[in-house]
Amino acid sequence: MNKEYKILDNGFLKLIDFMGDDRRIVKAARISYREESVKRKDAELIDYLIRNGHTSPLEQVVFTFHVKAPIFVARQWMRHRTARINEVSGCYSLAREEFYVPLEEDLKCQTSSNSSEKEFKSLEKLSDKIKHHQKHSYELYQDMINANIPKELSRIVLPLSLYTEWYWQIDLNNLFHFIKLRLALDSPKEIKENSPKEMREYAKALISIVREIVPIAFNSFENHFLRGKRFSHEEIIAIINALDLNKLSMDAEKLNLLKDKLGID
């Protein structure tokens, strides 16, 4: 805890506090049965819960993070409405002159066929224009502040690349969902390519933190959801017809789980 993960040029992610771990998930699950009829070992129980979508025990584990990111990242982040957020207020505090400037290779990566390649002779020139725009915007912001214009109105001239900070509290189940959506590992190629690189960097840092606190739960989540795939009924039928499942190198229990998932008696 208190380790600060440096992200982008001026951003960071830091775990402030957490409540619960793998043991809390197990205890929350077993209380439903008064610990009488659940014979599974702890790791097996957690895997069962995650695999079958029994998520309420995961909600017993809660994290609080301190995040610093550009406003355009923050607004995407806050689309996840299952968390509690306290953000730096532009009404009560002065904005700092801290802006995100993408690396030139990232500008090139995100450049489409009909973008401004013809207008700008080089990515270096484009990067310089971004910095100039940011500097000019902040100077205008300061002019408005010095003219005694209220902070909440003066900030309208600041770009989305301005850094903001917030405290973010979220339970493990919804954190897993956040990571899955933002990494887009199981998404079609087109969605992966359009997934914001900046958001993925924060999601990777979240993984580094969560993996240390709930290693058993994270391994199950990674296996079933982060790197797992969903199949349509049509695809399942095609798989069944193409494979001799009994020849798969899986132990009997996992093979039976696979057959059950595919609807094979």
UniProtKB/Swiss-Prot annotation:
Q: Which InterPro entries match?
A: Thymidylate_synthase_ThyX, Thymidylate_synthase_ThyX_sf
- What region holds the ThyX domain? 11-224
EC identifiers of the protein? 2.1.1.148
> Where's the active site on this chain?
182 (involved in ionization of n3 of dump, leading to its activation)
Residue ranges for motif ThyX motif?
A: 79-89
Instruction: Please list the cofactors this protein needs.
Output: FAD
Which domain of life does the protein's organism represent? Answer: Bacteria
Among PANTHER family, the record links this protein to: FLAVIN-DEPENDENT THYMIDYLATE SYNTHASE
Q: What is this protein called?
A: Flavin-dependent thymidylate synthase
Give the species this sequence originates from. Answer: Borreliella burgdorferi (strain ATCC 35210 / DSM 4680 / CIP 102532 / B31)
Ranked from the top, the taxonomy reads: Bacteria, Pseudomonadati, Spirochaetota, Spirochaetia, Spirochaetales
**Record gene name:** thyX
